[in-house]
């Protein structure tokens, strides 16, 4: 009953496991007058447009990774900037993978993203927080979150959220070093600090907005992109020096 009431009010509910990491997500299936139109356009998305959208997403992801390295003073990000400029339609050369190998060794030397360690715990929790609000924004905009642009796993109900989270990941990455501790088990303080990523400011079309606001704008812009068959309609966040809008949160 409690979860149903939350869903009626548009609240995304994260269900936590024993390790305090999100294990499941309940998102509201809010009635939306344009849902049928958006869903039809999403299902009929041409492959070439999907490839263009994915290239734009990955390009911005790598650019934000470069910005994160520069903001954290973790080295020379010029190689990442160069890689961002080589992304082709559909990321056919897997520039994303090349950039990831370089980026994570600069961000946290010795990091293995497959390991269960303190730094990965921080990243994974922060990503899950952003993924949840992004999934909500996509559903309320009329999208079927299981139908991705690039991700197409039949076992993943949130392929589209996993596509669009990519440029947002650096927002978590840039605050992670100040939150990580010696334990892979996150405490209440760490979880609270990671949830605050939603009030972190980013640039959207030259305007400072919170991550929480940015995910709504990304979802709305994707509606225009699939409706008009125009990749340039998609708006994506640009990472800036971390600052938080506590007034919006309160």
Residue positions per predicted region:
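Short hydrophobic alpha-helical runs that function as membrane-insertion/retention elements
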Residues: 11-17, 21
């Amino acid at each position: 009953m409690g979860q149903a009431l939350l869903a009626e009010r548009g609240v995304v509910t994260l269900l936590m496991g024993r390790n305090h990491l999100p294990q499941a997500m309940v998102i509201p299936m809010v009635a939306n007058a344009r849902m049928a139109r958006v869903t039809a356009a999403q299902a009929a998305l041409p492959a070439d447009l999907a490839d263009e959208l994915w290239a734009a997403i990955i390009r911005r992801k790598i650019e934000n990774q470069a910005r994160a390295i520069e903001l954290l003073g973790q080295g020379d990000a010029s190689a990442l900037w160069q890689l961002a400029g080589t992304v082709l339609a559909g990321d056919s050369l897997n520039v994303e993978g090349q950039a990831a190998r370089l980026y994570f060794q600069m961000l946290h030397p010795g990091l293995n993203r497959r390991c269960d360690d303190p730094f990965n715990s921080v990243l994974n929790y922060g990503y899950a927080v952003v993924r949840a609000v992004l999934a909500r924004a996509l559903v309320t905009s009329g999208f079927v979150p299981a139908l991705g642009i690039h991700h197409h796993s039949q076992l993943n109900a949130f392929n589209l959220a996993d596509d669009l989270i990519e440029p947002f990941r650096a927002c978590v990455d840039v605050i992670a070093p100040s939150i990580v501790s010696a334990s892979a088990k996150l405490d209440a303080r760490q979880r609270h600090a990671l949830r605050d990523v939603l009030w972190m400011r980013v640039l959207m079309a030259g305007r400072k907005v919170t991550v929480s606001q940015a995910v709504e704008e990304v979802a709305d812009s994707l509606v225009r992109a699939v409706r008009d068959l125009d990749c340039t309609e998609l708006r994506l966040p640009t990472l800036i020096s971390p600052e938080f809008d506590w007034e919006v949160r309160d």
